[in-house]
Amino acid sequence: MSSDSQVLYSQIPAIDTLLRTPACAALQAQYGSQLVTQALRSLQQQARHAIQRQQALPDWCVDWGVACTRRLAETLQPAMRRVFNLTGTVLHTNLGRALLPDTAIAAAAGAMGAPVTLEYDLDDAGRGHRDRAIADRLCALTGAEDACIVNNNAAAVLLMLATLAPGRDVIVSRGELVEIGGAFRIPDVMTQAGCRLREVGTTNRTHLHDYRQAIGEHSALLMKVHTSNYAIAGFTAAVSEAELAALGQEYGLPVISDLGSGSLLDMAHYGLPAEPMPQRMLADGVDLVSFSGDKLLGGPQAGIIVGRRELIHRLQRHPLKRALRCGKMTLAALDATLQLYQQPEKLRQALPTLRHLTREASEIAACGERLLARLRPHYEEAFVLTLEPCLSQIGSGSLPVDRLPSHAITLTPRDGRGGTLTALADRWRALPCPVIGRLQEGKLWLDLRCLDDEQALLQELCQ
């Protein structure tokens, strides 16, 4: 070790010395001595590494109290941070999908802070079933005989297959063997559920006789999978739920449908592309339908199964159900969300997902004009700022080919360098409330469809 290094190492204060400084004493009063000591030790280690690499102490060593304050803030920063979703994807999987309505947030908070009747029957003063009250609400909304709730739609599919088809064949069209995000594939789920995939038809065309020919002594289920994250167009043919349900009744085989997203609303009434509705599937004779809580429904993450009472009871009794069940916060939020569907006149304003999906392009453009006037003085030296029409997408595998007319503020670097644009995007992601846009065509796009608080955004971008 060189004499210069020895001098530098000697300038790193001891932990006890630092803890006795007024700044660190104040931090201990706020955060406790253990956490402050850990922060100081990590700073010491960082300083030693700097000496080893650069033969110099970091600049922050002039004030260890300030450095410790910053390190504590980093340590205690929430794992999930609030962001501005200006990506143009309404139901962004990586950003948490649906925003909960205020009533659902309040219901979840209420369930967290007090004892609730999660599995308690007030009438009988005995144990109840945690799905019961919500199941009744789902039955009223969908016309189902009963319902079952698990923690996501993948779990719903797994539970249906594991309960109804262990060791037996499940017949599915080859064109419906979907893969969703995270390499979640229907064939893999079938393997984990202990059943066998029986593919029928071709990628683009499947007929009723394909299903009929595949039925045999080992058949357990006929299954429909909604291709929610891709579309097959052109020379195509598919079997409807009503046709498949009639075939299932003929052979005594249950028919299940995985809607993926699913919607309790006729989206066409709101000027949006149509999405399959579980109540219509049940009316067509499908025995069980599964769909998500945190996509078009606009609630918390959950997998919802509705359909025949006898089959639902079998699902409830399966050992996997306990492993896949939802907690009280999820159930409280889901119940509050479903209550809004029983008051449809309030739905458009009360449900953030529906509000964002149906926001008029003219309203978004007006918002963009207001923001543009405020942002230009701060950024126009390095960037050209414009308001441009664009197309938002629904996201989370819902209506993959459909787009929503929107407007975005775009920033184009005057120096023409992509690095300038990337640096801006990096800087905005490092803000106290990160701003997430999208880089495309040499521009940074801020799609304003999902922006609810203009002033909060300006506070971040103009500070």
From Swiss-Prot:
Gene Ontology terms, cellular component aspect? cytoplasm
- Superkingdom of origin organism: Bacteria
SUPFAM superfamilies, alphabetized: PLP-dependent transferases
Would the keyword Zinc turn up in this protein's UniProt record? Answer: no
Q: Which GO terms describe its molecular function?
A: L-seryl-tRNA(Sec) selenium transferase activity
Kindly name one Pfam family recorded for this protein: Se-cys_synth_N
Q: Which cofactor does it need?
A: pyridoxal 5'-phosphate
Q: Name one GO biological process term.
A: conversion of seryl-tRNAsec to selenocys-tRNAsec
Chief subcellular location equals: cytoplasm
Which cysteines link up through disulfide bonds? Answer: none
Which reactions does this protein catalyse?
A: L-seryl-tRNA(Sec) + selenophosphate + H(+) = L-selenocysteinyl-tRNA(Sec) + phosphate
Compartment list: Cytoplasm
EC identifiers of the protein: 2.9.1.1
Q: Which UniProt keywords apply?
A: Cytoplasm, Protein biosynthesis, Pyridoxal phosphate, Selenium, Transferase
Q: Which residues carry this modification: N6-(pyridoxal phosphate)lysine?
A: K295
Which pathway does this polypeptide act in? Answer: Aminoacyl-tRNA biosynthesis; selenocysteinyl-tRNA(Sec) biosynthesis; selenocysteinyl-tRNA(Sec) from L-seryl-tRNA(Sec) (bacterial route): step 1/1
Q: So which residues are the signal peptide here? A: none
- Known function: Converts seryl-tRNA(Sec) to selenocysteinyl-tRNA(Sec) required for selenoprotein biosynthesis.
Q: Which HAMAP family match?
A: SelA (MF_00423)
User: NCBIfam families given for it?
Assistant: selA (TIGR00474)
Question: Subunit info?
Answer: Homodecamer; pentamer of dimers. Binds only one seryl-tRNA(Sec) per dimer.
* UniProt cross-references to PANTHER family, sorted A to Z: L-SERYL-TRNA(SEC) SELENIUM TRANSFERASE
Q: Which family does it belong to?
A: Belongs to the SelA family.
- What name does this protein carry? L-seryl-tRNA(Sec) selenium transferase
The source organism is Edwardsiella ictaluri (strain 93-146)
Tell me the gene name. Answer: selA
